[in-house]
Design a protein with these regions (language model features):
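N-terminal helix-cap/turn-to-beta initiation motif at the start of protein domains
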Residues: 19-31
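Signature of long, low-cysteine stretches enriched in small and polar/charged residues
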Residues: 96, 100-117
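Short, solvent-exposed loop/hinge segments that bridge or flank secondary-structure elements
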Residues: 29-59, 67-100, 126
């Protein structure tokens, strides 16, 4: 009898620990709030981006602008994106899970690019998800810029 109770307690503890670990890592898909990190609006919520998966690869598109008119177009974008509406535009593409987990940042995704619609430039990208926090880092050669995005709960 004592052995059965002990085994039951061990299973409950293990499942609870596993659930906590999975929640801490989080899931990438969903709605995320970006924060302006430059200029006069620094520190203000800037936009909502929808991160979505297609065939195991993640992308992000603009869902809503919070500091600009909803009909704003990408004046600084290059090629086919120039003059296109920002709402619905895919800014991040080809992000794949690496299998690495950083103890501070969480589960890592890499291999893709992120485009900054303010200047129209694209950068190599790595992201880490941990719970309701997403760390986004764009790289240009040995230089990088990091932003934190926050999950928007429906």
């Amino acid at each position: 009898m004592k052995k059965a109770v002990l085994i039951t307690l061990m299973v409950v503890f293990a499942l609870g620990f596993l659930g906590t670990t999975l929640r801490a890592q989080g899931t990438l898909a969903g709605l995320w709030k970006t924060i302006a990190d430059e200029g006069p609006d620094k520190g203000k919520a800037k936009s909502y981006l929808e991160l979505f998966e297609k065939d195991g690869v993640f992308f992000a598109r603009i869902n809503k602008l919070l500091l600009e008119p909803q009909d704003k177009v990408c004046d600084n974008c290059k090629g086919a994106l120039k003059g296109k509406p920002l709402i619905g535009m895919v800014l991040m593409s080809d992000m794949k899970k690496t299998g690495k987990i950083d103890k501070d940042f969480g589960e890592e995704y890499a291999g893709g690019e992120i485009m900054d619609p303010d200047n129209g430039k694209s950068y190599r990208c790595k992201i880490w998800v941990k719970g309701d926090n997403l760390t986004v880092r764009g790289y240009l050669a040995m230089f990088h810029r990091t932003q934190n995005w926050y999950r928007v709960n429906p």
